[in-house]
Regions:
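Extracellular glycan-interaction patches encoded by glycine-rich segments
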Residues: 125-151
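Extracellular glycan-recognition modules
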Residues: 3-62, 95-98, 162-165
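Short surface loop/edge beta-strand patches of beta-sandwich-type extracellular domains
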Residues: 1-18, 70-79, 141-143, 180-185
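Short tryptophan-centered beta-strand motifs in secreted/extracellular beta-sheet-rich domains
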Residues: 23, 82-93, 104
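Beta-strand-rich, repetitive solenoid scaffolds
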Residues: 7-9, 38-40, 47-53, 60-64, ...
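Short hydrophobic/aromatic patches on beta-strands that form ligand-binding or substrate-lining surfaces
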Residues: 21-28, 87-89, 137, 151-155
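Short, aromatic/His-centered strand-loop micro-motif at the edge of beta-sheets
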Residues: 62-86
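Extended recognition patches within non-cytosolic domains
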Residues: 1-5, 96-98, 103, 112-119, ...
Length: 190
């Protein structure tokens, strides 16, 4: 729905360096900035958004704190409004290699071609899992960009960076990426 959202503010701080976001999403509209999953408020924010500024209809993972600290935007364009997309963002800022600090999977495949690729510094503390920082699905507090579409099987994992195979698998007959409705994961504190 175009103007509904869920929000939760953690009462205790979890692991701000290592976490996983997994979500199945289906768009109703294309072409405008839409916030899918966020942490923070407008101006000090992070999360997943459909972005028109970095490549029309690109699903970007970002964090902005005065300037862009994280900006991972694949070249792949997501404009099919009849299709369910599965996105997994695995964050581990403790990694020595910058490109291992944020891994981006779309429909089971790790993305390797990016319009922008700004990785966080080593051991960076993100806005996610921070006590007192709002985590929101479908909106960003203080902003007007609601997500317009449907979402399913949203998982937020605190303390572990899982790859896409924890949340889905390829159908042996059709070759299509399919949902794992009961992922075997450890959710952590938040």
């Amino acid at each position: 729905m175009a103007n509904t959202y869920l929000t939760r503010t953690p009462s205790s701080t979890g692991n701000r360096k290592i976490f996983t976001i997994s979500a199945w999403i289906k768009r109703s509209k294309t072409g405008n900035n839409q916030k899918v999953i966020t942490a923070g408020t407008s101006g000090t924010e992070g999360g997943l958004q459909f972005s028109t500024g970095t490549g029309e209809n690109c699903l970007k993972f970002y964090e902005y704190v005065g300037s862009e600290v994280i900006g991972i935007a694949p070249n792949r364009i997501l404009r099919d409004t009849s299709f369910w997309y599965h996105v997994v963002i695995a964050v581990d800022t403790t990694q020595a290699t910058a490109s291992n600090r944020v891994k981006y999977y779309l429909n089971g495949v790790q993305e390797t071609s990016f319009a922008t690729a700004t990785y966080p510094s080593q051991n960076y503390d993100t806005l996610f899992n921070n006590s007192g920082t709002a985590n929101t699905i479908g909106f960003l507090i203080g902003h007007s960009a609601y997500f317009d579409g449907s979402m399913s099987h949203i998982n937020f994992i605190d303390g572990t960076a899982y790859d896409a195979s924890a949340f889905g698998s390829t159908d042996a007959t059709t070759g299509e990426w399919q949902i794992n409705t009961s992922p075997s994961v450890t959710y952590g504190t938040n």
